[in-house]
């Protein structure tokens, strides 16, 4: 999916949490309805078959309960996207990445090949299943991962065995670490630990810009990779590091140069998003003019960097909702020209499906440590709401999305608000900002109060109390969301082209 990701190490976050956040964006012209779900062990398949690639995999018989954000409309797979399991391991998958022709030739993607002819007749060729994809990964890994590293290991083994039909980035987190895995070609992969004092920005582009092969093949303190990566790179001359003697890759090399892309479309679709996110979190750098450290089209924007101050939930929401505010590239702005205002792909876009922020709080007990913040629809007009993950069920307001358009659930209410507010952006702006700030404040207080309420409970009683807290807060969110929908509907209705100032009737 065309998504945007930000990862925040525990020493760079406002409260010591590891933070993993990703927009799931539908393809252009598609608006995929989403919902929240808790998947129980008896609901997890023991034999899994992918809808898109027709790949069948036997799964272990000991899955854990986990949260997910699946598609609503059936027919093209689960697309579970993001969640936590019972051990407070988080996973967000996937960020679609780019690659290059050399990698595609060295390790082709594993595409599904339909059968040819009719079975039993001469010339019949059976279908060949494809590899793994975004449709599958959370379902295949999250129920079994015991730590962030373990999630990397499990997915890495699956990739080496079955391959993949697309290039993807995947985040794994626990209370101590965040790991970012990038697939390389059909069967290869690398993974890097996010520095504790740094954040990572990821548009739809292979991002890791420094990788230590010796560490990946040895202690694996900060790097992991597919078993034959060094030999494969040497065979196909993939390392582009200058001055390296011999045929093999450098011990420390730049994967973005070796495996990634620097295309014209990257400079319109991808690099501007990394530029703006880092502009927000490191504002003292020079971002504009001829002396700029980085421009929207720079190919060397760092994968990770230390922020100027600690990063909050609100910072994450802002950058993942952004449309280049304060620059000539803002599609709603007045700076620049019509050409500059439409030059680059916004992060907060009309086809945001959902945003999941996975927070693991070290100061909270394991029974209520994991909080999954959720937003649906276009991020420029929605609000994040917190949900405790250690629960048996999700509130109906978040879980009961249907294909039918209605204002009775959080997904469709936010879709309606976004479509109405977009056309009267400035007139609706104050109401939207007030809603976002109020719901955000309510969310922080909700978590603080619920933490206190469960702190002295026996562990076995905590999930039920957390579920009640989630449900009560969802009802408060419903009230605020309905009120905002009414406000933007009124504002946009008043501005309809067929309005007329003379009254026929006054009540």
Segments and roles (model prediction):
Residues 138-144:
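Short, well-ordered beta-strand elements within core beta-sheets of diverse protein domains
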Residues 2-134, 154-293:
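A contiguous strand-loop segment
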Residues 436-507:
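Histidine-centered catalytic/metal-binding microenvironments
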Residues 144-150:
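Short, charged, surface-exposed loops that flank catalytic or proteolytic processing sites
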Residues 21-35, 96, 181-183, 319-330, ...:
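Soluble extracytoplasmic regions of secretory-pathway and membrane proteins
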Residues 60-66, 152, 334-342:
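Short Pro/Gly-enriched beta-strand edge/turn motifs at strand-loop
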Residues 324-325, 329-456:
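Substrate-recognition/cap regions that form aromatic- and gly/pro-loop-enriched pockets
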């Amino acid at each position: 999916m065309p998504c945007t990701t930000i990862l925040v190490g525990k020493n760079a976050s406002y409260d010591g949490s590891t933070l993993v956040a990703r927009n799931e964006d539908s393809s252009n012209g598609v608006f995929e309805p989403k919902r929240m779900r808790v998947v129980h062990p008896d609901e997890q398949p023991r034999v899994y078959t992918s809808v898109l690639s027709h790949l069948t995999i036997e799964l272990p018989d000991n899955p854990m309960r986990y949260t997910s954000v699946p598609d609503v409309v059936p027919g093209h797979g689960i697309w579970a996207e993001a969640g936590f399991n019972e051990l407070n391991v988080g996973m967000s998958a996937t960020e679609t990445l780019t690659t290059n022709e050399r990698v595609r030739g060295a390790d082709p993607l594993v595409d599904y090949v339909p059968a040819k002819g009719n079975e039993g007749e001469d010339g019949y060729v059976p279908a060949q299943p494809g590899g793994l994809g975004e449709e599958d990964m959370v379902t295949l890994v999250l129920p079994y991962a015991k730590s962030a590293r373990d999630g990397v290991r499990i997915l890495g083994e699956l990739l080496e065995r079955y391959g993949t039909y697309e290039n993807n980035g995947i985040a794994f987190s626990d209370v101590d670490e965040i790991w970012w895995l990038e697939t390389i070609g059909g069967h290869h992969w690398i993974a890097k630990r996010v520095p504790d004092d740094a954040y990572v920005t990821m548009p739809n582009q292979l991002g890791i810009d420094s990788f230590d092969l010796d560490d990946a093949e040895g202690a694996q303190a900060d790097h992991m990779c597919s078993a034959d990566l060094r030999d494969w790179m040497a065979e196909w001359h993939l390392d582009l590091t200058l001055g390296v003697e011999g045929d093999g890759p450098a011990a420390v090399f730049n994967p973005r140069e070796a495996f990634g892309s620097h295309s014209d479309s990257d400079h319109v679709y991808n690099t501007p998003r990394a530029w703006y996110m880092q502009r927000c979190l490191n504002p003292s750098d020079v971002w504009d003019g001829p002396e700029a450290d980085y421009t929207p089209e720079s190919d060397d924007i760092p994968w990770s960097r230390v922020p100027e101050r600690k990063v909050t939930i609100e910072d994450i929401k802002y950058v993942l909702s952004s449309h280049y505010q304060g620059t000539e590239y803002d599609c709603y702005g007045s700076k620049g020209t019509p050409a500059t205002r439409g030059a680059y792909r916004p992060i907060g876009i009309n086809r945001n499906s959902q945003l999941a922020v996975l927070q693991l709080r070290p100061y909270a007990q394991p029974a209520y440590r994991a909080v999954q913040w959720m937003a649906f629809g276009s991020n420029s007009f929605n609000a994040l709401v917190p949900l405790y993950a250690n629960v048996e069920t999700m509130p109906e307001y978040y879980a009961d999305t249907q294909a039918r358009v209605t204002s009775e659930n959080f997904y469709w209410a936010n879709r309606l608000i976004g479509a109405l507010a977009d056309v009267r952006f400035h007139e609706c702006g104050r109401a939207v900002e007030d809603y976002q700030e109020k719901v955000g404040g309510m969310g922080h207080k909700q978590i603080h109060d619920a933490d206190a309420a469960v702190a002295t409970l026996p562990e076995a009683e905590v999930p039920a109390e957390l579920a009640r807290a989630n449900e009560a807060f969802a009802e408060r969110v419903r009230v605020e969301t309905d009120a905002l929908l009414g406000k933007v509907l009124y504002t946009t209705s008043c501005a309809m082209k067929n309005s007329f100032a003379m009254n026929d009737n006054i009540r």
